[in-house]
Amino acid sequence: MPKRTDIKSILILGAGPIVIGQACEFDYSGAQACKALREEGYRVILVNSNPATIMTDPEMADATYIEPIHWEVVRKIIEKERPDAVLPTMGGQTALNCALELERQGVLEEFGVTMIGATADAIDKAEDRRRFDVAMKKIGLETARSGIAHTMEEALAVAADVGFPCIIRPSFTMGGSGGGIAYNREEFEEICARGLDLSPTKELLIDESLIGWKEYEMEVVRDKNDNCIIVCSIENFDAMGIHTGDSITVAPAQTLTDKEYQIMRNASMAVLREIGVETGGSNVQFAVNPKNGRLIVIEMNPRVSRSSALASKATGFPIAKVAAKLAVGYTLDELMNDITGGRTPASFEPSIDYVVTKIPRFNFEKFAGANDRLTTQMKSVGEVMAIGRTQQESLQKALRGLEVGATGFDPKVSLDDPEALTKIRRELKDAGADRIWYIADAFRAGLSVDGVFNLTNIDRWFLVQIEELVRLEEKVAEVGITGLNADFLRQLKRKGFADARLAKLAGVREAEIRKLRDQYDLHPVYKRVDTCAAEFATDTAYMYSTYEEECEANPSTDREKIMVLGGGPNRIGQGIEFDYCCVHASLALREDGYETIMVNCNPETVSTDYDTSDRLYFEPVTLEDVLEIVRIEKPKGVIVQYGGQTPLKLARALEAAGVPVIGTSPDAIDRAEDRERFQHAVERLKLKQPANATVTAIEMAVEKAKEIGYPLVVRPSYVLGGRAMEIVYDEADLRRYFQTAVSVSNDAPVLLDHFLDDAVEVDVDAICDGEMVLIGGIMEHIEQAGVHSGDSACSLPAYTLSQEIQDVMRQQVQKLAFELQVRGLMNVQFAVKNNEVYLIEVNPRAARTVPFVSKATGVPLAKVAARVMAGKSLAEQGVTKEVIPPYYSVKEVVLPFNKFPGVDPLLGPEMRSTGEVMGVGRTFAEAFAKAQLGSNSTMKKHGRALLSVREGDKERVVDLAAKLLKQGFELDATHGTAIVLGEAGINPRLVNKVHEGRPHIQDRIKNGEYTYIINTTSGRRAIEDSRVIRRSALQYKVHYDTTLNGGFATAMALNADATEKVISVQEMHAQIK
């Protein structure tokens, strides 16, 4: 049956900001859906509040709304655009929940919109625990013994039946938010209280514990004629008890017998039929008891998921694209497989002749005080995928692609340590982010495979693989470099050992191993991901490396090529914004006739889609892997400035190896990053900087600090996302920093800067081609200096800065660009205090604000800069004037503190946000209000506000209090703040701080008395004292600000209506022309 003709226009719901549990895999699926449906001639309307996505580019849909994914806003869009259908399966849990809400509120019925891809009933049947259990029993499949509770009493009754340990999961939350494992009644009550609060339906599912069972997933696609295919089976390396998003996973499943696989395959198809998914992809999760083979269905997601992005990249089968076409009425046999160039239909089940491993990436070091043990609640922020011909090869490639300082199974503990075994046992039993390395340490320390199995419940087959690698490592260490003959080295390379790891084991430099391989002429070959195990020829160049005989890379020799290095796995500080830039570089250079080559290892992103570039190498972004690809492809230029710190770190070494790095030279990048060299440039240009010093010892720091004056910003040199960066207020604080946060030495200097308190911070993005400088945008931060720029909301155009100040910055940016010989993108950060402009830092690379500026101004900066790097001037491109839009755009960030109870949610110089949203309005207030709604803020228009501010904010707080009163708020204040307000004739109710007696602030927050809290602090002691206010505000969902500027922005936003007017990106950009 060909496509439906009764629908002409389709609304696609996006996933919104990136949060833990819902990352850029939904940009990948949404972008594919837009392409697939427009190919078929439908008018596509898209809503997504996240500006850092490819899917919100104006070319991707006919009407694109960067608006909050909130049912009232979406209703306005439906009313204006009148779509015939809505597709909710491409935007994760956010889109499903929004679609169900639109259905519940009667919006779909009111405007005659049909839901395609999944029916409201199928979504509800899969997501509602009780209905799901009944459905599974009906088809003869078991689910875990469980019960449902809506109150604490009901929960305790269920626990009595299920027993401890038990697993608690709230309904309709994502990434296991609010769930956990309870081993006793006390833990049980704590987890249930949190879960009831987080579940939108106030519903908990309490399950018997399946801890230690094996976990599997099936990616299934079904069409309306009941054609069903399994795209991929996935096995979790980690046993049940760890969220699948935090588990190492392997595809295809490795430890199932064929009979077990067939049973699971049939069961997963039966699940889709029973739930009623008949147009698209779903993921079904199973648990198997290794003791007796009992099979249980855990859950199913009736939508495209994180696993389906992985399955798509692992097999080359584009699940999201196929699902979008099935949603409009096609069947699988009518669709052709792109990768084989249409030689096979989409109803062919993919078969693969390689092994894929995914390892999650964690960021616990950003959250002091967080519980870093892995549970049923997802905590990872990104993932890496690797492809190899064996389990060992793909696992070792994934370890080095993860970029956590490991080149393979580097040891975590020294075996001389008397506590070594105790530590290893603890890490194996109670898994943290590094367990995989501790497993190797366990074998080094003499544990047997059975010993490790008893502690981890990881299948012995996987453990034997790791044990063998450890034994090989011991042999390399024993024979040294002289013992590495051609056969032995080939055997090691086939098992995935990195040159760098072998060098460490043999006690030589990495370059010597590379030289040895050159002598033996030992290089990897490249195989293709082709969905059909090489049965048919493929036109698509999607490659992975391995050490075998036949190379399938087949590089062209007649075209000029440019290679883009991607950013590797997502992490805080280096996320989707950098992937966005890489994709734009590839698209722009393709349009200009270059052959583009992408190198990356992140399965969630658009950059690793096989049709984003001409050739895709799915490889770790390390020196060894990149040099081997350069050797075979011989590109004219390589772009390292777009993928964040990952490729930048390789710039010098690549250049030294003769690789043509284009754009700003590695030397110029170093001049901006190296403190002393940068200082010389600044002095030559006579620009102002805050007083600063570079120190290499503690006593030296104490001396310099006296000259500069406190407070200080301290940080190690060369970091992204503000790692180990703090504000210190006095000498004792400075000494504490050196003892706990960093080790300082001649090789690792620490930078001290005078901290400009209360300054306004400004970000400027620009492009330089050597002849002229184009200002992309000037963004004024809402939080004052001292909050990491990646965690601060910002406005474009600036909302308080004078024209003169902005012109001073424009001139300074231009001078810096020429001085540093920038070719391509650059980002400059300034601070403005008492009408003076201070230069904070310069980054001659793509910054995380590039996508936001591009959406706000309509100038695709990353594309323009990529063309500049390839030698096309700004004048030739006709892009020479700065665009200042006639409307305001505000970027707001999304923070993951709800996943890390116990962490202080105070914003500071260390970046901790995972994602961003954008709001657009005619006034700053309207734009800010929309950004707040988009970031799921709990802002209320009135009620009771609590004010507790530091000494330096007391003058300005009076004005803020007056604004809140005018808005209809009642006011409470702590002692010091109340005195200042009283003197100004405002009489708030006085409240006790926690140590002043009860009822105190925390009691009042718990009782739900406040709708808004503003709490600003300075000094270590005050920060510690007031931490309980911020934690409680977060826990009880009270909107709070930790800076006075944030408070003023909030007060302005209270007057605006965020749901009143919607505007598409296309309409915005038309106003600029």
From Swiss-Prot:
Residues 554-936 are annotated as: Carbamoyl phosphate synthetic domain. PANTHER family: CARBAMOYL-PHOSPHATE SYNTHASE [AMMONIA], MITOCHONDRIAL (PTHR11405:SF53), CARBAMOYLTRANSFERASE FAMILY MEMBER (PTHR11405). Keywords: Amino-acid biosynthesis, Arginine biosynthesis, ATP-binding, Ligase, Magnesium, Manganese, Metal-binding, Nucleotide-binding, Pyrimidine biosynthesis, Repeat. GO terms for cellular component: carbamoyl-phosphate synthase complex; cytoplasm; cytosol. Binds 4 Mg(2+) or Mn(2+) ions per subunit. InterPro entries: ATP-grasp, CarbamoylP_synth_lsu, CarbamoylP_synth_lsu_oligo, CarbamoylP_synth_lsu_oligo_sf, CbamoylP_synth_lsu-like_ATP-bd, CbamoylP_synth_lsu_CPSase_dom, MGS-like_dom, MGS-like_dom_sf. Residues 133-328, 679-870 form the ATP-grasp domain. NCBIfam families: CPSaseII_lrg, PRK05294.1, PRK12815.1. The large subunit is composed of 2 ATP-grasp domains that are involved in binding the 2 ATP molecules needed for carbamoyl phosphate synthesis. The N-terminal ATP-grasp domain (referred to as the carboxyphosphate synthetic component) catalyzes the ATP-dependent phosphorylation of hydrogencarbonate to carboxyphosphate and the subsequent nucleophilic attack by ammonia to form a carbamate intermediate. ATP 1 binds at R129, R169, G175, G176, E208, L210, E215, G241, I242, H243, Q285, E299. Mg(2+) 1 binds at Q285, E299. Mg(2+) 4 binds at E841, N843. ATP 2 binds at R715, H754, L756, E761, G786, V787, H788, S789, Q829, E841. Mn(2+) 3 binds at Q829, E841. This is Carbamoyl phosphate synthase large chain. The keyword Metal-binding applies. Mg(2+) 2 binds at E299, N301. One of its GO terms (biological process) is glutamine metabolic process. Mn(2+) 4 binds at E841, N843. Its cofactor is Mg(2+); Mn(2+). Mn(2+) 2 binds at E299, N301. Composed of two chains; the small (or glutamine) chain promotes the hydrolysis of glutamine to ammonia, which is used by the large (or ammonia) chain to synthesize carbamoyl phosphate. Tetramer of heterodimers (alpha,beta)4.
